[in-house]
Amino acid sequence: MWKNPNFFIHLPFKKTEDVNPIKASHREMNPNHLALAKQELSTLLSEGLIEPTTSPWACEAFYVNKHAEQVRGKLRLVIKYQDLSHFLAVDKFPLPNKSALFQHLSNAKVFSKFDLKAGFWQLGIHLEERYKAVFCIPDHHYQWTIMPFGRKNAPSQFQKAMVTLFQPLLTNALIYVDDILLFSKDEESHEKLLIEFYNLVKSHGIMLSEKKMVMDSLL
């Protein structure tokens, strides 16, 4: 889906403030972190998820030695977007209230739960906007082609895309960012709902996390 221009996101600046591009002067990385970053970014480059840039913007990327910042026991590259976020306009698309969502389930008996794999990465960034989604490590400067984690407005923009994409199913689907819950009154109607869901997933090239799927759970 990230290559579908119909779902490319924009990163508009505030109209009420002068925008001064900020280019981080990167502090030194220790040799182990730098080697790890180069390896990780080489993979992202080969997959087309980032690309070299000459943007006037640059946000510092670094590793944090905290358990909360680790992914499956491995260090996670963190990007400091605060300077860029200051200039970005707020996306006002509302995120649903989690407790209010469950009010729609009073008559539901059958459920299936899905989670999008690497959720935000499934949305591309408009070609003319990529120069804003930029980060650097020592001697390297890149821009994202997809929506990165941790960026301002990412949850709202992703919610908007998912609601638009799954609009035909919303009477029997709850969507909270990259989590989708399908619900039906009986197994027969749920089977039809799943067929519609998978057709949309396939037609838009959406990737689901198999590990987090919960299928045909009965109440």
Describe the residue ranges of each PLM region:
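Reverse-transcribing Pol proteins
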Residues: 1-93, 140, 173-179, 183-185, ...
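Mobile genetic element proteins and their domesticated derivatives, centered on retroelements
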Residues: 9-13, 44, 61, 80, ...
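Conserved pre-motif C helix in the palm subdomain of viral-like polymerases
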Residues: 35, 106-109, 120, 141-172
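Active-site palm subdomain of RNA-directed nucleic acid polymerases
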Residues: 49-52, 155-196, 201, 207
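Conserved catalytic palm subdomain of right-hand nucleotidyl-transferase polymerases, strongest
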Residues: 70-86, 101-122
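Cytochrome P450 core scaffold surrounding the K-helix E-X-X-R motif
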Residues: 85-92, 120-132
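A conserved non-catalytic segment of reverse transcriptases
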Residues: 89, 145, 205-219
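Catalytic palm active-site di-aspartate
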Residues: 115, 150, 170-185, 212-219
